[in-house]
Every structure is written in C-alpha cells, then in structure tokens.
Amino acid sequence: MTILHNFINSSKRNLSILGIFLLLLLVSSCSSNEEMPDERLVEKELYDQAQTRLKNGSFSTAILSLEALESRFPFGRYAEQAQAELIYAYYMNSQFEASQSASERFINLHPRHSHTGYAFYMKGLAAFTDDSGLFSRYFQSDLAKREVVMAQTSFGELSEFISRYPESKYVPHAKQRMIYLRNLLAEHEIYVADFYMK
C-alpha cells in the first residue's frame, strides 16, 4: 500500500513540475513573440518600427527590428542605415563587443560612407567601458588596479578616429574620453610603481 501511495505522490509531484514548466514555456514564448518584428512588415514599416523602438529606449527590441531589416532587405533602401544604427543600439544595450563588431563590419563594408567616422568613434567608445554597473556600485572597484588593455585599445581607436576625422562633431567628446583614459592609464602606472616599491 505504501509503495502505491509513494508512486501516486511522486507522480503528482512530477505532473506539477511538468505543469509549471509548460506554463513557463507558454508565457516565455508569448512574450518573445510580442517583441519579434512581424515577418509581413515591408521594409519601410520595419525601419519605422526600429526608429520608434530606438526613440523609446527599447534597445533590445530595436536590435531585433534592425537585425530583421538587415537580414530581410540586405540591399534595401535602409540597409546601410540599419547597420549604422545597430552599432548604437548594441552600445546602448550594453552589448559592447557586438557594438565593436558592428562598427568594424560597417567600416569594412562602407569605407567611404558618411557614417564611417561615426563607426570609428563608436568602435573606440565600445572598446572600454568603466564599471558603472550594479556590481561596482556595491563593491568599489578601483579601475586603475584592473587590467588596462581595454583602456589602451580604446585610447588607440579614439586617436585613430580623431586623426581620420578631425572635423567630426564627435571629436570633442572623443578628446574628453581620451583624457579620462590617459588619466586612468597614468593611475595604473602609479599603482604598479607603488606595488613594486613596497
């Protein structure tokens, strides 16, 4: 009798777990379908949808729209603009490596495009981001003590941007960022010197 009772209880528990799993699966599939761009949208509608999402700060869904626009209409009217805006959307969505990759891709595909300077600028910005996330708010990490390869890379990328596009409207911000990075690198050198002097 106890064997049958245990079997029934374990079956009920397994069914409950299965039911919860199916419910979660159903809810997650419904929510992701709302964010995905409608496959029936024409190029202009998809572009407008992406613009609305960017303006609203919905960067993850804007990325979906821009990627769909680029993949469905690779030679369309908005393809190059979508590629440029993907750089920004990735960056704003804290997908810095994707932003760098999108920048490099845009530079390679469109070396003479009017937005190529912007791609160089964003590539430099995305190469280094300080710890402004949740972890660093609670655990004060000293950026000067960390590995600074990314800061050096960012400094080099921004320097290249300024030398190639000295008249760009992004140059003043790039120069400010380079001052910040130079100070960070100097702090790191002082930290290393202090470490070896002890």
Question: What does each model-found stretch correspond to?
Answer:
Residues 2-7, 26-198:
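Acidic, polar-rich low-complexity tracts and alpha-helical solenoid repeat scaffolds
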Residues 18-27:
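Bacterial N-terminal signal peptides
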Residues 2-19:
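Bacterial N-terminal signal peptides that target proteins for export
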